């Protein structure tokens, strides 16, 4: 059966030889992001010196015989990767090494994402959508956005979907219900140990999760810190950071924007300009969002914070603000 394509999108993926990209690329080629009727002009980027590994990734994609892949190239040139793209998935980042402080990581990645933002500014389409995965993701996303003034600030996203998925699963397991019975899962703030999984907004079988779970102490003192520290727990258990789950979360995060479901809430880090919650402008901050018929998103308005959640959000806001201040001095 010949698949009829309705459109083709140009897509760049950085960090193309890494573990997350290795899982994500095949989901992308399969149609999990843009749908089964959308062709893909794919450019895979990684650093000079990794050409041989990139060629191996290309071999596997070629061998997968994906009908949606209309063109495929691997490159060590950001200009080549970002030229005329509709979407970029910025996965590559400097990893946090043993004994490395978060401030050291901010400095190293500040240079990487400043350059990538500058090249996006000169090379990508003005309405390109940019998804940042490399940590510290909120601040890396802000750096790239600040270096790309030609692009629409609203189209920069930092990934919080993995945190959302973790919370979704924990609530379903605790309530002993299928995953599709859980909705309105919200992550506020930074993707870090200070993120805010807001259980007060979540619904289980259409009822408030707080009522269904019936154990506020578990929500505050077991579930919340478990989600905040899940990444570290995976590293401790596996010896490596989350990869397959992160790739799936990235595909879902992008799909929520490109192929939205009616009324679906999704958590994503976006530019805080004109937000309805009083968060200072010019930050990348995690909000619950939903898509509009126009193809744009809106931050879900009108949600109330109890004292516990409000205090946690302030802590996360302080962290993001401090990270921004630190990189602004670089």
UniProtKB/Swiss-Prot annotation:
Pfam short name (any one): Ldh_1_N
Residue ranges of the TM segments: none
Binding site for NAD(+): 15-21, 109, 116, 133-135
Top EC group: oxidoreductase
Lineage top rank: taxon: Bacteria
InterPro entries for this protein: L-lactate/malate_DH (IPR001557), Lactate/malate_DH_C (IPR022383), Lactate/malate_DH_N (IPR001236), Lactate_DH/Glyco_Ohase_4_C (IPR015955), Malate_DH_type2 (IPR010945), NAD(P)-bd_dom_sf (IPR036291)
Catalytic activity: (S)-malate + NAD(+) = oxaloacetate + NADH + H(+)
Molecular function via GO: L-malate dehydrogenase (NAD+) activity
EC number: 1.1.1.37
GO biological-process terms attached to the record: malate metabolic process; tricarboxylic acid cycle
Residue positions binding substrate: 96, 102, 135, 166
Active site: 191 (proton acceptor)
Keyword vocabulary terms for this entry: NAD, Oxidoreductase, Tricarboxylic acid cycle
SUPFAM superfamilies: LDH C-terminal domain-like, NAD(P)-binding Rossmann-fold domains
Its biological purpose: Catalyzes the reversible oxidation of malate to oxaloacetate.
Family: Belongs to the LDH/MDH superfamily. MDH type 2 family.
Protein name as catalogued: Malate dehydrogenase
Gene transcribed to yield this protein: mdh
């Amino acid at each position: 059966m010949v698949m009829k394509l309705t459109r083709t999108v140009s897509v760049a993926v950085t960090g193309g030889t890494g573990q997350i990209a290795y899982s994500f690329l095949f989901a992308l080629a399969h149609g999990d992001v843009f749908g089964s009727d959308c062709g893909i002009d794919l450019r895979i980027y990684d650093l000079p010196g990794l050409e041989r590994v990139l060629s191996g990734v290309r071999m596997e994609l070629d061998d997968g015989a994906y009908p949606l892949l209309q063109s495929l190239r691997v490159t060590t040139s950001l200009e080549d990767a970002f030229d005329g793209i509709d979407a970029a998935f910025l996965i590559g980042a400097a990893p946090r090494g043993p004994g490395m402080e978060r401030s050291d990581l901010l400095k190293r990645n500040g240079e990487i994402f400043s350059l990538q933002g500058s090249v996006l500014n000169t090379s990508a389409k003005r309405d390109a959508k940019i998804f940042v995965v490399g940590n510290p993701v909120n601040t890396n996303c802000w750096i790239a956005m600040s270096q790309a003034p030609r692009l629409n600030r609203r189209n920069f996203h930092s990934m919080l979907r993995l945190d959302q998925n973790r919370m979704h699963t924990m609530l379903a397991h605790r309530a002993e219900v299928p995953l599709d019975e859980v909705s309105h899962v919200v992550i506020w703030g930074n993707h870090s140990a200070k993120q805010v999984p807001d259980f007060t907004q979540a619904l289980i079988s259409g009822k408030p999760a707080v009522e269904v779970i019936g154990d506020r102490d578990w929500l505050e003192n077991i579930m919340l810190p478990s989600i905040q520290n899940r990444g570290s727990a995976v590293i401790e258990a596996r010896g490596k950071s989350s990869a397959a789950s992160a790739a799936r979360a990235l595909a879902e995060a992008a799909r929520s924007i490109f192929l939205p479901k009616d009324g679906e809430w999704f958590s994503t880090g976006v530019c805080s300009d004109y937000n309805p919650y009083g968060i200072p402008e010019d930050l990348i901050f995690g909000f619950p969002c939903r898509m509009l018929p126009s193809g744009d998103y809106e931050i879900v308005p009108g949600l109330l914070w109890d004292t516990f959640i409000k205090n946690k959000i302030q802590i996360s806001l302080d962290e993001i603000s401090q990270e921004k201040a630190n990189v602004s001095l670089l």
